[in-house]
Structures are given as C-alpha cells and as structure tokens.
Amino acid sequence: MTRSIALLGSTGSIGRQTLEVARELGLSVAALTANKSVDLIEQQALEFCPRLAVLYDEDAARELRARLSDTNTQVLSGMEGLLAAATADDADTVVTAVMGMIGLQPTLAAIEKKKRIALANKETLVCAGELVVDAAEKYGAEIVPVDSEHSAIFQCLQGCRDRGEIKRLILTCSGGPFYGLSLQELAIKTKADALKHPNWTMGAKITIDSATLMNKGLEIIEAMRLYRLPLRQVDAVIHRQSIVHSLVEFHDGAMLAQLGTPDMKLPIRYAMTYPNRAVSPAEPLDLLKCPPLTFAEPDEEVFRCLKIAKQCAAIGNVYCAAMNGANEEAVAAFLRDEIGICAIPDLIEAALDKTETVYQPQLSDILEADRLAREVVREKLN
C-alpha cells in the first residue's frame, strides 16, 4: 500500500500495534508522537524513519533531539508539535491513538486538512463529538473508527443506504474482570485485580475503565456522536467471549453482527485499508471451536460509571466533557493507590454537581468544563 500515516500516540498499546500493522502492510510513517517515552520512540524512529517525531514533554524532546541528531527526523515538542504531526503534508491518514482530551485539538486540525482520521481516541467524540463530526462534514474528512466495537458498527453499516433504517446499535462488553460481583465484593478489589482483563491486552487507563464499565459508557456516547443517534437507539450488552464485537438492529427485524478474534490489529488494519481489506496474518476465528456465545444485561447499580455516562449522554452539553475529565483524574488516583475503585464514580458525581450548563458550547467551553471537573476531583483528593 502507498498510504502514509501520522501516528499520534506511538508508544501506547494501540500505537505499538499500529506500527506492527504498518510494518505488515508496508505503510510509510510520516510522523510519530508520544508523551515522554524517549527510548521507545527513538527505536521506532530509527526503524520507520519519520520526517517528524514529537515528544510532548520538552525535556524528553530535548534528549530525543540529541539522540536523533544524525538522522533526517525533526524533533518537536508540546501541543505545537502534535499539531504539526496532525497536519503533516506527507501523511494522508492520521491515527489518533493518544489517550485523553489532549487528542482533541490535533484531531480537529487534521480534519481541517481533510485527512482520513483513524480514530482510536474516544475522548475526542465523547467530549466534542458534535464539533468533530460537523467539522468532518464541513471539510470532507473521513473518520474511520479503530475501537473494536465502533469498527464493528462501521463495517455492519457499509450496506446501509438509509440511516433511518437503523433501529438500534448494540455495543458488546466483556464485563471486565469484575463481572457478576456485588457492590460489597467490588469495593475490596485492588489495582492489580482491576488490571487483569479477561480478553484484551490494553493500556492501564482503558483497562480500569473496562473494569468500571466506564469504557462502555464512553463508547455509547461515541456511537451517538459518530452516527448522530439518540441514547434510546444505542445500547450495550455483556458478552463475555468478546467474539461478537457489536451489532446493528434494523427496523425490519434483521440484525447484522461483526465477529472476530479479540485482536486489536484487526480493526486497526481495516482502518488503514478501508474500503479495501488486506490479507491478515492473524489467526482466523474458527467457528467450530468457538465457545457458546452469551449475552446479558449490565448491572448499572454495581457499575455506576455506566449509569453516570448514560445520564451525561442524555443531558449532553458540556457534561460529557466534565465526566470524562473527572474520570481521568479519578482513574489516575486509583492507579496511584490513593483511592478504592468504588470512589471513582463518587468523584465523578462530585465534579458533575459543580458543572454548569453552557448554551451552545464551543471548544473553549468544552475545555473549560474539562479543566474545572479535574480541579474538583483534585481538591477532593487533597
């Protein structure tokens, strides 16, 4: 393939797997970005020879600049560097694999340059979905989701000529490591317990979100924004086997599902090659060896983060951004062993109680809601 990518977040789980796919497909890499992982991005830059490498942390960027001084790779830092990578003229596809709100501005900048967006940064759509989708339509940019669930929905809708035919999008959810526990049992679970996802290998933050089911809440909001559907048309079910990645139900009673092994390189590869499909070295799904496929309703009283996310989805406005910011701060505190897992929804609710509705919110309002929510959580922690 001749596609050239700018990879935002190259040292995280999705970023590393994206480079594996790039290697398999023979893609060129125009830009790499990370936070401050000097050693890993140096290795990546030496292999893929990007024109641009970015470390958000200035001290780390200074060290990388010295290490790559005898190469043709330019090293930048900060948001300026991220924006340069996202708008690189020699990249036709921007893979947004960074975690959190930091991916929002680079994504919007890439959209204005009419890039294909391979979207793995769910916070972009959760916090500013209407702005992002409106911008993509305005500039003619293509958004291809990388999340396994949204990739599944995207694939199921390829033959759908009229979105009015959709009755429901159904996102599947493994249930995480704590499926079936009571609230009392959940309260004593530790960080080590929460990081043991039954089916997927992911980064720490998204693994904790999967344990609290916040990840599914974020994905419900993401689907609402991406396909412009109300909450009543987007649902989630527990599917422990992670074989059915999501389903679309149509008004005529038909239901389409996308099945596959739980391997993130499959949706990454599809986002790189769409509308075509490339031969994959991955082990194919063997239907004769599949376990029985089961589906169940999530327990929103135990996993309150899912309930909170749905409430914010129904309200809209800046509440999704506030919820996301508060969740990021609370999860970070949990990963530092400062709070228990059941304190995460408590902190999110405390931040939402302080959030005020903004009439027709703009990007600045969304960023401010995120900032204030984080501030509330930090004050509670102190």
Locations of the language-model features?
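Catalytic, metal-anchored helix/loop core of enzyme active sites in primary metabolism
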Residues: M1-N382
